[in-house]
Amino acid sequence: MFKTASGEEIFIIDGHVHNWNATKANQKNMHGEQFINCFYAYHSFLSPKDQLWTREKFDQYGGDQLYQDLFVDGPDDMAIFQPTYLKDFYVDGFNTTEQNAVLKAKHPNRFILNGAFDPRDGEAGLDALDELAATHKLKGVKLYTAEWKGDSRGYKLSDPWAERYLERAEKLGIKNIHVHKGPTILPLDRDAFDVADIDVAATNFQGLNFIVEHCGLPRLDDFCWIATQETNVYGGLAVALPFIQKQPKYFAHVISQLLMWLGPDKLLYGSDYGIWTPDWLVKAFMAFELPEDIAKETGAVLDLEAKKKILGLNAAKLYGIDIEAQKRLLAPEQAVPREPSSNVTLQQVAEAS
């Protein structure tokens, strides 16, 4: 829970977290090492100095550390697990639904557990999706269109098999389709993350919500032109948000474009933990104000009401979460109340970097 200087409580749903295993023992080949090296480079480049982790910790931090960083030291109230299997790179997978389910079982009121599918798995994959949905009562999935599988280096949501999987997801009540459409990660191919196929899928599947993780970066314009027309396309701010202290002008450009084209009702906060931790991200976001010239040019408004929507209300709507009821469920395990922190300035956050 984030509490403003005036005492107002803001319910926070972190829309993008992981609990991965990238240890040497789990790396199947050089590509597993390349992948986590790239993640660590993003972490090192955009994190404040006092938030930098050792490489050993970064490779596998574990569930206890995750809980501490999100809900005790951090302001998150709930978090959504977004799995990334990468079975061609990691022996037991990088960050799987099955791994995440262990922590979900331990803290059922804290986590939303999403699944995943890969249309290249054919009929067997459809059966597996049925089983996964039944076991975990899924409301969402995370897709990684650039994931390698054998000789294939990606797929598109407009592929015939992908459409069969989306049809099955809708039939199963899996309404929220999170898709990585953002920066590439070595060794994956940049163009396999192209955002264009979102346009086709969103048009063809009006009963589904497509949450474009990372807002299509570096293809921000392409994403905005699609999302402003497709009523069922949303933007996830993971990766975009950490630029807030390293390159605030760039972040101001990104968030103003998103607000101008999509509005505050279609944007979701995500820390992308464990690349970054939520405490400094939320503090910086709450302290951030759009530069006057950008606000005037775009007409974008990033006031407290907009921030509340982005930080939790929008995700709650997509996942059918009654926030007041959820607060009551969480009350027994709430940590010592956090001190009001909205008076933290961006300069103070930047000074730690």
Task: Say what each PLM segment does.
Residues 19-20, 183, 217, 275:
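Short active-site segment of divalent metal-dependent hydrolases/proteases
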Residues 1-15, 21-70, 127-131, 261-266, ...:
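Mid-to-C-terminal alpha-helical segments outside catalytic/metal-binding sites
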Residues 16-22, 180, 214:
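Histidine-centered divalent metal-coordination motifs
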Residues 61-68, 96-101, 125-129, 195-198, ...:
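Alpha-helical scaffolding within the catalytic cores
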Residues 28, 139-140, 154-269, 294-301, ...:
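Catalytic pocket-lining loop regions of alpha/beta-barrel enzymes
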